Amino acid sequence: MDYRTVFRLDGACAAVTGAGSGIGLEICRAFAASGARLILIDREAAALDRAAQELGAAVAARIVADVTDAEAMTAAAAEAEAVAPVSILVNSAGIARLHDALETDDATWRQVMAVNVDGMFWASRAFGRAMVARGAGAIVNLGSMSGTIVNRPQFASSYMASKGAVHQLTRALAAEWAGRGVRVNALAPGYVATEMTLKMRERPELFETWLDMTPMGRCGEPSEIAAAALFLASPAASYVTGAILAVDGGYTVW
């Protein structure tokens, strides 16, 4: 192992869902800086255009697709493979909804599960086929510390349940594909300063509790999550599969 290049992704082609914004976009920045070619996937065409313009020559293709559509993910994988063999998949697309369980409507529950769980499986299955056939690949899933603990003071049963499912899906695929050369791992971020958490961070009754319960006393930055994703996708993690890597400022050590 060459320690000078072990975190590089030169020659790799990485497909990233949710690539148009937030942590997904930050992961694209990290991968591009490390030499990867990128397949950007997002349901928002305008967000993809902005991301592609920023990332420039690193972008091999941009695909407008909704992860909740299984057929769209199959088509996206085929389109991506026609450009270059995809050796890395990052499942970053995700949503969160705050709600009390007794007041949760069916549509909200189904939407969260459709994006966070179904979408991750559809994408993993679609891109995993070629990886398994080639005998090589790495998948990085965006889980959450919410898949391990119960958040407070806010309630979000659908989000927590979905991220618990993400962690188990990660382990299941890791076990199934380990002997076929494909590694599958997940990140479990804590509270991160993204657009998705902005409205919650502006509520003192939530934000102050978050900081009090985080040993490091602050939110994470998207770049800190992207750096962890880079590790899991890179040759540096060649003997790592089925891991749920906490990147939460120590929140889950309590």
Swiss-Prot record:
MF terms (GO), sorted A to Z: metal ion binding; nucleotide binding; oxidoreductase activity, acting on the CH-OH group of donors, NAD or NADP as acceptor
Enzyme nomenclature, EC number: 1.1.1.406
Record-stated family: Belongs to the short-chain dehydrogenases/reductases (SDR) family.
Binding-site residues, NAD(+): S21, G22, I23, D42, D66, V67, Y159, K163, V192, A193, T194
Principal EC category: oxidoreductase
Cofactor: a divalent metal cation
Full protein name: Galactitol 2-dehydrogenase (L-tagatose-forming)
Induction (UniProt): Constitutively expressed.
Protein task: Catalyzes the interconversion of galactitol to the rare sugar L-tagatose. Shows activity with a wide range of substrates, and catalyzes the oxidation of a variety of polyvalent aliphatic alcohols and polyols to the corresponding ketones and ketoses, respectively, and in the reverse reaction, it reduces ketones with high stereoselectivity yielding the corresponding S-configurated alcohols. Shows high activity with D-threitol, xylitol, 1,2-hexanediol, 1,2-pentanediol, 2-hexanol, L-erythrulose, D-ribulose and acetoin. Specific for NAD(+).
Cofactor note: Can use Mg(2+), Mn(2+), Ni(2+) or Co(2+).
Field pH dependence: Optimum pH is 10.5 with 1,2-hexanediol as substrate. Optimum pH is 4.0 with acetoin as substrate.
Quaternary structure annotation from Swiss-Prot or TrEMBL: Homotetramer.
Biotechnology and industry use: The wide substrate spectrum and the stereoselective mode of action make GDH a very interesting enzyme for the production of optically pure building blocks in the chemical synthesis of bioactive compounds. GDH could be covalently immobilized via thiol bonds onto the surface of a gold electrode, which represents a proof-of-concept for the development of reactors for electrochemical synthon preparation using dehydrogenases.
Keywords associated with the record: Magnesium, Metal-binding, NAD, Nucleotide-binding, Oxidoreductase
Active site (record annotation): Y159
Modulation of this protein's activity: Inhibited by the chelating agents EDTA and alpha,alpha'-dipyridyl. Inhibited by Zn(2+) and Fe(2+).
One of the Pfam families matching this protein, by short name: adh_short_C2
Family annotation (InterPro entries): NAD(P)-bd_dom_sf, SDR_fam
Tagged with keyword Magnesium: yes
Catalysed reactions listed for this entry: galactitol + NAD(+) = keto-L-tagatose + NADH + H(+)
Binding site for Mg(2+): W254
